[in-house]
């Protein structure tokens, strides 16, 4: 399962981080049924494979009296769901269900102190998620047909203001916005 991480500091005010990872397994492994005085049957687990790719990157910066951050993330996978193993009927319930996932988001943050009396924090995020689940009786007679697709999008924005009247007296004013579909 390879993974690559690259981090770089461009200068005193800008740096980055990027990471990519790939995961794969066949999910085929031997297992044995046990009984009181030993092993009875050995089978091979099927449809337990997983394939996944994850990538993310970030930029980080400094501004006078503040900082900003930006990040992007992507994940894609496909996997099988292994079915039941029944000793009396080995291999009958093959269970060929599959699931596919896609996840993506981008987010950012900005914080700055404009004066000894006022500072600001802004945050934002957009996310997109997709899930596809398939159970097909043409591949596995023990299941009913299911072909589900789920889509979700989300946006989030936040602003926080801080006012400093005295060292012992501060006031905050914040607002959030969230939009979500499923």
Locate the predicted segments by residue:
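Flexible loop and strand-edge segments within Gram-negative outer membrane beta-barrel domains
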Residues: 27-29, 42-52, 66-120, 124-153
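Transmembrane beta-barrel strands of outer-membrane/channel proteins
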Residues: 1-4, 18-24, 70-76, 122-128, ...
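Membrane-embedded beta-strand positions in outer-membrane beta-barrel channels/transporters
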Residues: 3, 17, 54-56, 103-109, ...
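An exposure/low-complexity boundary signal
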Residues: 56-63, 67, 73-79, 177, ...
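A general secondary-structure boundary signal
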Residues: 21, 61-67, 107-109, 154-156, ...
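Exposed, low-structure sequence patches enriched in small/polar residues
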Residues: 118, 123-125, 154, 162-182
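Outer-membrane beta-barrel channels and translocator barrels
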Residues: 11-13, 23, 63-66, 113-117, ...
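Predominantly transmembrane beta-strands of Gram-negative outer membrane beta-barrel pores used
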Residues: 1-36, 42, 54-62, 69
């Amino acid at each position: 399962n390879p993974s690559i991480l690259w981090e770089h500091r461009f200068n005193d005010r800008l740096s980055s981080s990027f990471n990519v990872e790939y995961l794969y397994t066949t999910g085929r492994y031997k297992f044995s049924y046990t009984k009181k005085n030993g092993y009875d049957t050995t089978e091979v687990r099927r449809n337990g494979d997983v394939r996944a790719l994850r990538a993310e990157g970030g930029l980080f910066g400094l501004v006078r009296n503040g900082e900003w951050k930006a990040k992007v993330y992507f994940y894609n996978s496909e996997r099988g769901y292994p079915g039941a193993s029944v000793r009396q009927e080995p291999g009958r319930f093959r269970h060929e269900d599959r699931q596919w996932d896609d996840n993506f988001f981008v987010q950012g943050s900005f914080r700055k102190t404009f004066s000894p009396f006022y500072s600001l924090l802004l945050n934002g995020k957009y996310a997109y998620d997709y899930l596809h689940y398939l159970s097909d009786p043409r591949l596995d007679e023990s299941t009913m047909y299911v072909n589900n697709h789920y889509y979700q999008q989300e946006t989030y924005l936040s602003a926080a203001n801080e006012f400093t009247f005295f060292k012992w007296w501060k006031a905050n004013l914040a607002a959030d916005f969230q939009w979500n579909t499923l």
